[in-house]
Amino acid sequence: LFYRYQDCTFFNKKDILKLHARFYELAPNLVPMDYRKSPIVHVPMSLIIQMPELRENPFKERIVEAFSEDGEGNLTFNDFVDMFSVLCESAPRDLKASYAFKIYDFNTDNFICKEDLQLTLARLTKSELDEDEVVLVCDKVIEEADLDGDGKLGFADFEDMIAKAPDFLSTFHIRI
């Protein structure tokens, strides 16, 4: 079972066992000790976002939703391992960028539009900017990152912007 995870993640067997222990700790009444007995268990988002690695993150719900196959934010062990794998230090920039894009695309239209940027900014600044400041920042981001001039950021625009952010890889990660 664990070899399968080793093949498609950035983890070794020890890491995967540690992740299973963490998953079990989140909901011991739901998750069996021996995962092979009941592999499709969904741990609710409300428990996942209480993890120390996510608790203070302003995007915790969006992060969990991005990895949730059921679309409700509930995670299976597969989803949980995927989340930690993408957010680990070993994951490549393009993989991290694709999930970051999903997280910031609040309206799920496959673009990061002005409204998505406003929601992102509100979370990052804890709504401390006034409306004019928010509009100014969002306009500036679109002006600088919108390569094709359509008034929104497609994935290529976003990826180009991320490539210019040297701290992206070091900030878009969590440790197990």
Curated annotation (Swiss-Prot):
Keywords: Calcium, Cell membrane, Cell projection, Cytoplasm, Magnesium, Membrane, Metal-binding, Repeat. GO terms for cellular component: cuticular plate; cytoplasm; photoreceptor inner segment; photoreceptor outer segment; sarcolemma; stereocilium. Ca(2+) 1 binds at D105, N107, D109, D116. Its main location: cytoplasm. The keyword Repeat applies. It is found in: Cytoplasm; Cell projection, Stereocilium; Photoreceptor inner segment; Cell projection, Cilium, Photoreceptor outer segment. PROSITE patterns: EF_HAND_1, EF_HAND_2. SUPFAM superfamilies: EF-hand (SSF47473). The binding of either calcium or magnesium significantly increases the structural stability of the protein in comparison to apo-CIB (calcium- and magnesium-free form). This is Calcium and integrin-binding family member 2. It comes from Ovis aries.
